[in-house]
Regions:
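Extended effector regions of multi-domain proteins
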Residues: 1-205
Length: 205
């Protein structure tokens, strides 16, 4: 993040629970930056699948005698609704896009790994104007069959519709996403609670 924060003016010292006073009488509102990366990946060909990987530990016993071992569980996200996912750092959740028809030198499907980094979840309520028009932001991962006209996660004209366009509308059909030409949509962002140090020009972070 960098740049110049949006500001509003009011009586110095007035209480604004959703803003930071930067100078006497000058506030910067709290806000979020939420982005979506459309990733059309062709891993050794166009027929790909997306796999969710989670880590877990067995109770102490035959499979985990000292309590320090853990395993992974893989789930193919075979349809659009199954592929609407949130991050879960407790399970070290990540996603792979693989080509199930091509193997590497040890016999596993070739692929790439998407590791979620620092991100946030929208604080705008789903029933708000923003929540309706940017419904894509309520999942961290979406997977769709590749369609050239499906370009923007909030639809082509988010300011000209009442809500529901883009990813929520397209994925309502629950199209298959296994072993086909797929697009991964990764949603990420951050909360920006302005500081006095952000004024007049933000540092780079």
């Amino acid at each position: 993040l960098t740049g110049i924060v949006l500001t509003l003016a009011d009586t110095p010292g007035k209480d604004h629970p959703s803003a930071t006073e930067l100078e006497p009488g000058l506030w910067a509102p709290y806000h979020q930056h939420i982005l979506c990366a459309r990733m059309d990946l062709d891993i050794d060909g166009t027929n790909n699948s997306v796999v969710e990987v989670e880590s877990f530990a067995h109770p102490i016993g035959e499979k985990n005698p000292y309590g320090g071992a853990y395993e992974t569980r893989e789930t193919i996200l075979a349809s659009e609704k199954k592929a609407q996912r949130l991050i879960d750092p407790i399970k070290s959740r990540f996603w792979k896009i693989i080509n199930p028809n091509k193997n590497n030198h040890v016999g596993h499907s070739v692929g790439y790994k998407l590791i979620p980094g620092h991100t946030t979840f929208p604080l705008a309520l789903e029933g708000s104007v923003l929540g309706k028009r940017a419904g894509f932001m309520y999942q961290h991962l979406w997977v769709t069959p590749n369609q050239d006209h499906e370009r923007y996660p909030a639809g082509d004209y988010p300011f000209q519709h009442d809500g529901g366009a883009g990813l929520p509308e397209w994925t309502a059909a629950d199209r298959p996403t296994e072993n086909t030409d797929v697009v991964m949509w990764y949603v990420f962002g951050t909360n920006h609670i302005p500081r006095t140090e952000d004024w007049p020009v933000m540092p780079v972070e």
